[in-house]
């Protein structure tokens, strides 16, 4: 059974950050903010995403001032429905009521 997940990341290295974003897109997750993705994952896909992110992170030895931090958070449909959205992108300014997520 699939569950909705939010995946947040704080990655200082541009190449690593771009690899993570491309990986998450390829796995079918939707980017909802610059460093946040969301999508439905069953347990098998979740393990696959987790393993892939670990592989990406382990490819580079980080310097002392660098960060590679990823947080994967499951959320229920009720929690998602109760979300509070503040703001919109420039293209949504005219259609604030049509914000999907």
UniProtKB/Swiss-Prot annotation:
It is an enzyme of class 3 (hydrolase). One of its GO terms (biological process) is maintenance of CRISPR repeat elements. Optimum pH is 8.5-9.0. It comes from the Archaea. Its cofactor is Mg(2+). This is CRISPR-associated endoribonuclease Cas2 1. Forms a heterotetramer with a Cas1 homodimer. Homodimer. Its EC number is 3.1.-.-.
């Amino acid at each position: 059974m699939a569950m909705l997940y939010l995946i947040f990341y704080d990655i200082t290295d541009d190449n690593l950050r771009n690899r993570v974003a491309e990986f998450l897109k390829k796995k079918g997750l939707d980017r909802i903010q610059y460093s946040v993705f969301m999508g439905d994952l069953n347990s098998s896909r979740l393990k696959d995403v987790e393993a892939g992110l670990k592989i990406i992170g382990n490819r580079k030895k980080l310097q002392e001032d660098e960060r590679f931090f990823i947080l994967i958070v499951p959320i229920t449909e009720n929690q998602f429905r109760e979300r509070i959205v503040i703001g919109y992108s420039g293209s949504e300014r005219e259609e604030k009521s049509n914000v999907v997520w």
